[in-house]
Amino acid sequence: MSIRTEKVASLLQRELSAIFEKELPRSGPLATVTEVKVTADLGIARVYVSIIGSEAQRAELMEFLHTETKALRKILSSKIRNQFRRIPELEFYEDRLFEQANRIEELLKSVRRGPAEEQL
């Protein structure tokens, strides 16, 4: 990534995080923007979202993000329009890195305990 795309990605991540904090329903799962990757032409921003909640809540929130992409882009545009000629299209992806890290941690703990302790 070039310095420009990194700066744009950082700005988008910061602004989208603020939008998520203020605009998403409070009763739902906790959602955090973990990473934003922007294409070289600044036309598409891939937004990775970490969601803490049940599988059903995750699916519901991802569906919400996909259906409300245009509305979220419009809110984003109102916040940063003076910095860009054209706001990138937003694509949302679920980031399961936190979940995978927890699973690896559990596996490591079970290996450290050994098979004799697991049988107790």
Curated annotation (Swiss-Prot):
HAMAP family: RbfA. Belongs to the RbfA family. NCBIfam families: rbfA. It holds the Pfam family RBFA. It is found in: Cytoplasm. GO terms for biological process: maturation of SSU-rRNA. The lineage of its organism: Bacteria, Pseudomonadati, Chlorobiota, Chlorobiia, Chlorobiales. One of several proteins that assist in the late maturation steps of the functional core of the 30S ribosomal subunit. Associates with free 30S ribosomal subunits (but not with 30S subunits that are part of 70S ribosomes or polysomes). Required for efficient processing of 16S rRNA. May interact with the 5'-terminal helix region of 16S rRNA. One of its GO terms (cellular component) is cytosol. Its main location: cytoplasm. Gene3D superfamilies: 3.30.300.20. One of its GO terms (molecular function) is ribosomal small subunit binding. It comes from the Bacteria. This is Ribosome-binding factor A. Keywords: Cytoplasm, Ribosome biogenesis. Monomer. Binds 30S ribosomal subunits, but not 50S ribosomal subunits or 70S ribosomes. InterPro entries: KH_dom-like_a/b (IPR015946), RbfA (IPR000238), RbfA_dom_sf (IPR023799).
